[in-house]
């Protein structure tokens, strides 16, 4: 059972990793590294914020109705991240549309789906010439012998 769960988890993680293009992953890794160096925390690929370090005694004794400053900062950061993700998704949609247009421009102006039918008259003419050339070669060989 553990093997099955581990396999599923690994497969799921691989699918998530493949879903993001390489450039986006690299950009997210660079941002995470910069945040880690500055001590703010790190961002996972899913866009969730994970704080670094152990919980402090101040946070444990704080009352539930108080809102710590770090929570509001986290909320602002999460909103910024959501906006960035939405912007990246819009850019991705634009590039997909542009790539479809480029593929349509590469298509020939006149569709030649049935190549055999289009080339058949030329092939008949070429076959006829080939047969005449073979006959002439055989005649010249017979005359020499």
UniProtKB/Swiss-Prot annotation:
Cellular localisation: Secreted; Host nucleus
Alphabetically ordered keywords of this record: Glycoprotein, Host nucleus, Secreted, Signal, Virulence
Region (Disordered) location: 38-77
Motif range (RxLR): 27-30
Keyword Signal: yes
Keyword Secreted: yes
Carbohydrate-modified residues: 59
GO CC term (a single one): host cell nucleus
InterPro entries, A to Z: mRNA_splic_Cwf18-like (IPR013169)
One Pfam family from the record: cwf18
UniProt comment concerning the protein's domains: Has the canonical translocation RxLR motif, but lacks the canonical EER motif, which characterizes most oomycete effectors identified so far.
Function: Secreted effector that dos not suppress the host cell death induced by cell death-inducing proteins.
Official protein name in the record: Secreted RxLR effector protein 100
Organism: Plasmopara viticola (Downy mildew of grapevine)
């Amino acid at each position: 059972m553990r093997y099955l769960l581990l396999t599923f988890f690994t497969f799921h993680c691989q699918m998530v990793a493949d879903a993001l293009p390489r450039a986006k992953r690299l950009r997210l890794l660079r941002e995470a590294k910069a945040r880690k160096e500055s001590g703010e925390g790190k961002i996972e690929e899913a866009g969730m914020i994970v704080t670094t370090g152990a919980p402090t005694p101040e946070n444990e004794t704080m009352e539930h109705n108080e809102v710590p400053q770090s929570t509001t900062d986290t909320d602002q950061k999460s909103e910024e991240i959501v906006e960035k993700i939405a912007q990246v998704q819009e850019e991705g949609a634009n590039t997909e549309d542009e790539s479809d247009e480029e593929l349509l421009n590469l298509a020939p102006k006149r569709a030649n789906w049935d190549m055999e039918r289009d080339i058949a008259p030329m092939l008949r003419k070429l076959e006829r010439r080939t047969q005449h050339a073979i006959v002439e070669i055989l005649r010249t060989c017979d005359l020499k012998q």
